[in-house]
């Protein structure tokens, strides 16, 4: 089975594909992604209205099989929040790890010093990926009970981000 998927930037016109991808998954598969399951429209609206936030998709044979994003930049946060979703049909092929590497490289190239994420404490596989990649558990989110993790990025190659106009 070919597991290759290309990474492509997502645009507002891709919002319906994102909704269709989430809608095609079972509640059981979505159990670790409460925001994707309970409010996919909010995600699609975030993509439609993005400015500084970054959204990428995994395309396999032209079909969206996953997406990942760095959010919070539109709201002025200096530390973006990483999120990733891979369809069950494309899971266990290393796409989440590729997504994380791509997002972290983008942050470093933009002079961003750290990234945060939230992960369900029962999602042992994802937690192990994040710990292996240097994320530290910093606290539990009181609203979602998810573990908040953070990673400081390498500063020696950072360039300064231009000030907003």
Which residue stretches match the model-derived regions?
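Acetyl-CoA-dependent GNAT
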Residues: 9-15, 20-89, 100-101, 106, ...
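Conserved GNAT acetyl-CoA-binding A-motif
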Residues: 79, 107-118
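Glycine-/small-residue-rich active-site loops that bind phosphorylated ligands and cofactors
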Residues: 87, 91-92, 122
